[in-house]
């Protein structure tokens, strides 16, 4: 007889997914200082020998193919300062979006040069393997499995000037959301699989006024193994969706569903990059 398992997400869950996350920053000038504005979120992914970032189509459309952008990570081990830049002229992109606001699918992928990907890995970034099936079961007899969901992304309104100033610029603190889903509602819109999420703030004091910046962020399905005492012993993850719009009251987020992610992989990414060979032996991440 199956038993429903209730899991409360806390800070211990952030590590398994936040190391996959990245925010995009668009640079500008204000007087003599450089400015950085959050433009959305993405997830580090890989397929065969191809490395890149999966995000929303409308996020990537705001970034010119020849401009240099900032990449801000939300690592489990926080560095003192980040200043990573990516010249998009050295990348290639595919977009699955018709250009109409709020229409789905709204997905995009931008490749990363191997040198950048390797350096990101060396600094703790983890690339989610799009070529692996994700099926999880308890590793020990008698253990139970539970499922919960979490949304990860940049919150634009939480971006603020940092305390430290520098000769050629200033420090910017970029706020990130790791939000446990209070409700998860899969539905179809014009035949496309979407997921609507309402985030719970029971475990955190900050509630954003909007989800600006979260677009392109991952909706994770977390498969949690619990021992006989109900203690979490393992957390596995599956990319369940990619956020792309918020509700009119700014309380809910809608994500592209898993089938739409599978479609861009099959129809756009694999045909565009010969090195994206899902049949090649790969190590799970």
Segments the model singles out, each with a brief description of its role:
Residues 66-72, 121-130, 165-168:
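"Short basic amphipathic alpha-helical interaction patches in structured regions
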Residues 205-237:
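Catalytic nucleophile loop of clan PA
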Residues 190-206:
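A conserved mid-domain beta-alpha-beta active-site/ligand-binding segment of alpha/beta enzyme cores
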Residues 14-116, 154, 176, 182, ...:
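Catalytic histidine site
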Residues 204, 236-285:
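C-terminal cap/linker of serine protease catalytic domains
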Residues 104-128, 146-147:
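Internal, conserved structured core segments that host functional sites
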Residues 1-27, 276-285:
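Non-cleavable N-terminal signal-anchor transmembrane helices
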Residues 129-178:
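Short glycine/Trp-rich loop-beta-loop segment that forms part of the substrate-binding cleft
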């Amino acid at each position: 007889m199956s038993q429903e398992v209730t899991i409360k997400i806390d800070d211990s869950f952030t590590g398994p997914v936040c190391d996959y996350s990245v925010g995009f920053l668009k640079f500008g000038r204000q007087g003599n200082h450089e400015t950085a504005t959050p433009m959305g979120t993405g997830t580090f992914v890989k397929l065969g020998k191809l490395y890149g970032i999966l995000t929303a189509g409308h996020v990537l459309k705001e970034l010119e193919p020849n401009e240099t952008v900032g990449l801000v990570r939300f690592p489990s081990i926080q560095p003192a300062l980040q200043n990573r830049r990516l010249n998009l002229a050295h990348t290639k992109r595919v977009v699955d979006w018709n250009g109409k606001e709020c229409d789905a699918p709204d997905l995009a992928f931008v490749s990363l040069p191997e040198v950048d990907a390797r350096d990101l890995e060396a600094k703790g970034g983890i690339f989610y393997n799009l070529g692996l099936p994700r099926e999880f079961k308890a590793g020990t007899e008698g253990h139970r499995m539970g499922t919960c969901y979490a949304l990860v992304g940049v919150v634009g309104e939480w971006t603020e000037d940092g305390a430290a100033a520098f000769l050629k610029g200033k420090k910017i603190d970029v706020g990130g959301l790791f939000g446990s889903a209070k409700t998860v509602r899969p539905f179809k819109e014009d035949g496309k699989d979407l997921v609507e999420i309402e985030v719970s703030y029971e475990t955190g004091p900050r509630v954003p006024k909007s989800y600006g910046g979260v677009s392109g962020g991952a909706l994770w399905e977390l498969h949690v193994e619990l021992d006989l005492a109900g203690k979490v012993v393992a957390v596995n993850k599956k990319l369940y969706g990619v956020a792309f719009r918020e509700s009119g009251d700014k309380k809910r987020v809608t994500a592209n569903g898993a089938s739409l992610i599978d479609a861009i992989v099959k129809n756009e990414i694999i045909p565009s990059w010969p090195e994206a060979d899902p049949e090649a032996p790969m190590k799970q991440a």
